[in-house]
Swiss-Prot record:
EC number: 6.1.1.16
UniProt name for this protein: Cysteine--tRNA ligase
Localization: Cytoplasm
Positions of ATP binding: 275
Binding site for Zn(2+): 29, 215, 240, 244
Single annotated GO MF: zinc ion binding
Gene: cysS
Provenance organism: Synechocystis sp. (strain ATCC 27184 / PCC 6803 / Kazusa)
The keyword Isomerase is assigned to this record: no
Length: 483
């Protein structure tokens, strides 16, 4: 069966046909780093981690990029509130992000570009839009002219004539930039510098980029003009992803992405999660009382495009479900030695047996992981039952070779979904450095180099190298690292 996925642009399931056979390029709109991650972030990050893992199991190489927005009004406000800086706030919450994702078993992306590290590409894209007549400077800002792009609204299904901007098309008082726009629907690509805020030189004067242009530039810089999968939460469809399409396709004349995939939002007891309602929960707070594997299972049990209602009943059911799977996964470690089983094995591929085939048939239908889980629960319950016979009766009449195949199959399928009875770090090494630790050390080294404190920069480089981390210094002060 061919993998079919629901494309938000065509509003239909489409067969996956990557631009380059065997390779899937994938971009996810990441977080704005001004606070700790919450349940909505957990749902999004786990969802696309699952998709990436499944594609890899299906034989694809996946090149996965997820950005950090580290220039934003919310970050600046947090910095002011804490008497800190935008850079310090960003570093703090980027490190916290990696800690949270490691706990949830989310594998690191191949690259985490930041807005502040992509400024040259951002300015280059804005200049091209201006040259082609899609952007115009006004009062030190630069705006995108929405009406000049014929395809605007094709992702969200919205038409400009159906949208309202204040009364009778007039700009509302809530839009402080309205007086500088040629049209109420235009949006900022570059914002002029304000007193006390970080700013960068540009052809239009000192300032900082708008939010939407950042992702368009990062996709282009790190993956190319057209990618296979552009993914994110469905709250980003309009205006963010709509604006990305307008920006990128106006310059290239090519589709920004072959497929647009969006996950549903998280609700808490049927209500939208928000701080004002008092139902806002961070990942780290939740992990104090809930097994991270139960959280992954909760995400798996609902279809990724549907809303996920987080309730005590739902998390209890996920916890119970995880206990069942865990008992099945433990079977071979508890009894395999007595049977002479080899406990170290190569995980099974898609066509290994009837259960892997059934799993693939389910998940190939628009990432129906719940259907795949049904196969796993069937195996887990059977293994648990056989384990009870061995525990209480001392023997089982079951075919031991078949039991071994069933156990290896369950372990293999669980690995695809990032479910582990020993949920060790997916992103730490023998030296104990997590991705968050590495990001902090790299940031400290970058600052030392900016301060011309070469001795400290060299010391931090040596610390990282001793931990097995390779640093690659790029133009513009960007440093990439690899294990």
């Amino acid at each position: 069966m061919t993998l079919r996925l629901y494309d938000s642009l065509t509003r239909a399931k489409q067969p996956l046909q990557p631009l380059h056979p065997g390779l899937v390029t994938m971009y996810c709109c990441g977080i704005t780093v001004y606070d700790y991650c919450h349940l909505g972030h957990a749902r999004t990050c786990i969802t696309w981690d699952l998709v990436r893992r499944y594609l890899q199991w299906s034989g694809y190489e996946v090149r996965y990029v997820q950005n950090f927005t580290d220039i934003d009004d919310k970050i600046l406000k947090r910095a002011v509130d804490e008497s800190s800086t935008m850079e310090a706030v960003s570093e703090k919450f980027i490190a916290a992000y990696f800690e949270d994702m490691e706990a949830l078993g989310v594998q690191p992306a191949d690259l985490y570009p930041r807005a502040t590290h992509t400024l040259d590409g951002i300015k280059r894209l804005i200049a091209e839009l201006e040259a082609k007549g899609y952007a115009y400077p006004s009062g030190g800002d630069v705006y995108y002219s929405v009406r000049n792009f014929d395809g605007y609204g094709k992702l969200s299904g919205r038409r400009l004539e159906d949208l309202q901007a204040g009364a009778s098309g007039r700009v509302t008082v809530a839009d402080p930039d309205g007086a500088q726009k040629q049209d109420p629907f235009d949006f900022a690509l570059w914002k002029s510098a304000k007193p006390g805020e970080p700013a960068w030189e540009s052809p239009w004067g000192k300032g900082r980029p708008g939010w939407h242009i950042e992702c368009s530039a990062m996709v282009r810089e790190f993956l190319g003009e057209t990618i296979d999968l552009h993914v994110g939460g469905n709250d980003l469809i309009f205006p963010h992803h709509e604006n990305e399409i307008a920006q990128s396709e106006a310059v290239t004349g090519q589709p920004l992405a072959q497929y647009w995939l969006h996950n549903g939002m998280v609700k808490v007891d049927g209500e939208k999660m928000s701080k004002s309602l008092g139902n806002f929960t961070t990942i780290r707070a939740l992990l104090k009382t809930v097994d991270p594997m139960a959280i992954r299972l909760l995400v798996l049990q609902g279809h990724y495009r549907k809303p996920l209602d987080f309730t005590e009943t739902a998390i209890a059911a996920a916890t119970n479900g995880w206990h069942t799977l865990r008992e099945g996964l433990q079977f071979g470690y508890d009894y395999g030695g007595d049977f002479g089983w080899e406990l170290a094995f190569t995980p099974l591929g898609p066509d290994a047996n009837q259960w892997t085939v059934a799993f693939q048939e389910a998940v190939d239908d628009d990432f129906n992981f719940a259907g795949g889980l049904a196969v796993m629960f069937e195996l887990a319950k059977h293994l648990r039952s056989e384990g009870n016979k061995l525990k209480f009766e001392g023997s089982t009449p079951a075919d031991l070779d078949l039991l071994q195949t069933q156990w290896i199959t369950l372990v293999s399928l669980a690995e695809i979904l990032g479910l582990s009875i020993n949920p060790e770090s997916q992103s730490s090494n023998d030296n104990g450095l997590t991705d968050g630790d590495i990001e902090q050390l790299v940031a400290q080294r970058t600052q030392a180099r900016k301060d011309k404190n070469w001795a400290e920069g060299d010391r931090l480089r040596d610390v990282l190298q001793e931990a097995g981390i390779t640093l690659v210094d790029k133009p513009g002060g960007l440093t990439e690292w690899f294990r």
